[in-house]
């Protein structure tokens, strides 16, 4: 077959296939045009998942009669000069959206420029353009797309259900609305109830308001403001505290110079920043806004402009990691401690409570009377778990695995100056797992296992980066039996385990010999530790960087080397744990993202008893 020139109509349809993949693609292109036109209010309406009808109305600058005639021609644009290709500052710039859409659908445009006495309208049906005629419209532009892809029936076969396509449109509009909180958006259609996002105030508060409206009130409550800047590149935005996560990565939003984009390298930076806070199966919720010189980023990588290429991707990644880690560390204590007093009050409120119906004699058996005892006691028991390791020397003697915890019944917990410390003074332990501490203005509840797990984890990391992890040699190597596949996984990573002081070697089929363990873990159960490590290694991606693999190893070791639930602690031990928490970075959350402590203010306690 000889080479021949394709007809213009076919060329347009090929271009449409690249730019307009589905109704959501058309909505994206049209809304971006409305934003570029300076619109302060943009209304979107759809029918049939956008397949039957899409209507976009804005109050932007509009077009003159001459501009309207060119707008439906290929590669005609008002957003690009000869020398601007490397300095793209607008969302749409190729001049492809309108002609591409009109080549596969019915397109009607009505627009009015401030300099025109009235509006102008044009219709395009599968590439066939009508004459431009006068019309009625306030300043701005109204674009209506009907029967999308009717001129390319093959494309219709690949569209999903109306509900699925409508959801894709909603996600596109959500992202654009997050990028521009200064613009009011309305999304309506037969598939959904109308949603309106009012224009927000400029700055971080307005941005958080818009993000909260879209991502939910939980995000607004748990949001941490983050930011970092270097060499002309700035990263700003909000990230949810580790206590608010998702089962997938769909809650991670990235915007570059106001453009919603997807970038695997940058989102990998988000995972790295949260690695010390979240388990492997949970994902953070973030909205990050990167601003840099347009010459430093290529927005022309993808026909739909959903991907970008950075000239210095390493710098952008480093700034994102720094911004997130700094924000998480800075707000760690606040996000862990600030339990909503109103929520606690509601949880404890009893309907129908009456003062007459609650006499002192009605205390349940075992109820505690503050008049008869100066401090809350716990029953004397033998410590059944391994010793707690990692405290300072002043409290180390208290952790003797073979000795029972002392009976402190009736002993007053020493207060001294500890009441003024962030985590206060330990008063008692409840349910053999939670420490109750008193502060000057309330009380603190600490999960002893979660708190010590974070302390051990941070110490393991610090040891690795300094002089190496201290080891303890076993007098008699411990032989651990497991399936051959698990043994192979462990032996394949033996050099990595060695970095953390865990020395293993083969002991025949289906067994390994443990010769050394990290000193920080004390008398940890080596068999249980190795089995957990083998299970976690089975889930590792082979491409996972060595640093991340080592962090996973440290997290698993920390869990096994921590004070266990059910271990009775003396007051000295509890206070030692509180002081260690205050000196440990990221101690507000355990390695799995759960809070290590919560705080209840005195004002909230008084509300529980009707004193406020």
Swiss-Prot record:
Residue runs in coiled coils: none
GO molecular function, one term: ATP binding
Transmembrane segments: none
GO cellular component, one term: mismatch repair complex
UniProt GO BP: mismatch repair
Alphabetic keyword roster: DNA damage, DNA repair
Entries under PROSITE patterns matching the protein: DNA_MISMATCH_REPAIR_1
Top-level division of the source organism's lineage: Bacteria
InterPro entries per record: DNA_mismatch_repair_CS, DNA_mismatch_repair_MutL, DNA_mismatch_S5_2-like, HATPase_C_sf, MutL/Mlh/PMS, MutL/Mlh/Pms-like, MutL_C, MutL_C_dimsub
Entry keyword annotation includes Iron: no
Entry-linked Gene3D superfamilies: 3.30.230.10, Histidine kinase-like ATPase, C-terminal domain (3.30.565.10), MutL, C-terminal domain, dimerisation subdomain (3.30.1540.20), MutL, C-terminal domain, regulatory subdomain (3.30.1370.100)
SMART domains: DNA_mis_repair, MutL_C
Family indicated by similarity: Belongs to the DNA mismatch repair MutL/HexB family.
Role noted for this protein: This protein is involved in the repair of mismatches in DNA. It is required for dam-dependent methyl-directed DNA mismatch repair. May act as a 'molecular matchmaker', a protein that promotes the formation of a stable complex between two or more DNA-binding proteins in an ATP-dependent manner without itself being part of a final effector complex.
Name under which the protein is recorded: DNA mismatch repair protein MutL
Source species of the chain: Afipia carboxidovorans (strain ATCC 49405 / DSM 1227 / KCTC 32145 / OM5)
Gene this protein is translated from: mutL
